[in-house]
């Protein structure tokens, strides 16, 4: 097979002499997707790559501080990164060592599924995974008119929330909910508690990145209703999208 050159999500040309067989993933969502689809090709992942729970690969530290020496030692023919989750500096250093790095850029559910399909079919030269087809069926169709106002908290002390142009925001919209902070000038703005604690708003409290729980989060709100939700279902793209619609809807609307 002749070498293939493809443009990643940031339009960077990445050359592959052969379909990659030794893959390091720096993105938890994509690690789960790879481990579910082609586990024999996945040789390294970050400490934050928690799914599947029985994943056994070399760990290469965190998403923001990967152990570049450990990655090099694995002799990967592909490293998968993400514009938001990983540092451009680390991507550049790996590329300078001659390692192909494929960078994804995810802001919507359809965009995530398209990006993952390209990764599996064009880069890895595999077929479309069954879970991806199921996710398309579950999340396809037009965005419904919103019926519930929500805010998505991601941190406290200081409070932060989901703002504009995010994957999570698109998930929320496709569930038929209106993110009351979607008009923010920032993607993840710092906010005052009063910006979230409003009459008629449901505040979603996920368990990542901040670990909200029954005794840490709901007690701060006196006006808004709160709902503890799975951060993975709300923020990860990949196999976790299958079944996420029903689970998130049940957590919020009962």
Task: Tell me what each language-model feature is.
Residues 1-254:
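N-terminal ligand-binding lobe of clamshell/alpha-beta domains
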């Amino acid at each position: 097979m002749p070498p293939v050159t493809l443009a990643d999500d940031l339009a960077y040309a990445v050359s592959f002499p052969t379909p990659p067989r030794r893959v390091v993933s720096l993105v938890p969502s994509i690690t789960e997707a790879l481990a579910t689809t082609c586990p024999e090709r996945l040789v390294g992942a970050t400490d934050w790559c928690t799914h599947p729970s029985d994943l056994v690969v070399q760990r290469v530290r965190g998403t923001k501080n990967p152990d570049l020496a450990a990655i090099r030692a694995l002799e990967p023919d592909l490293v998968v990164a993400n514009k938001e989750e990983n540092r451009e500096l680390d991507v550049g250093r790996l590329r300078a060592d001659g390692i192909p790095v494929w960078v994804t850029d995810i802001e919507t559910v359809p965009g995530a599924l398209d990006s993952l399909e390209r990764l599996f079919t064009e880069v890895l030269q595999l077929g479309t995974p069954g879970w991806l087809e199921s996710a398309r069926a579950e999340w396809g169709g037009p965005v419904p008119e919103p019926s519930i106002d929500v805010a998505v908290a991601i941190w406290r002390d200081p409070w932060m929330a989901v703002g504009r142009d995010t994957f999570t925001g698109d998930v929320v919209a496709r569930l038929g909910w209106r993110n009351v902070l979607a008009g923010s000038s920032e993607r993840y703005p710092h906010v005052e508690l009063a910006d979230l604690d409003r009459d008629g708003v449901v505040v979603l409290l996920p368990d990542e990145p901040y670990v909200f729980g029954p005794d840490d989060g709901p007690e701060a709100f006196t006006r808004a209703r709160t709902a503890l939700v799975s951060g993975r279902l709300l923020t990860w793209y990949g196999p976790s999208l299958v079944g996420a619609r029903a689970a998130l809807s049940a957590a919020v609307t009962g």
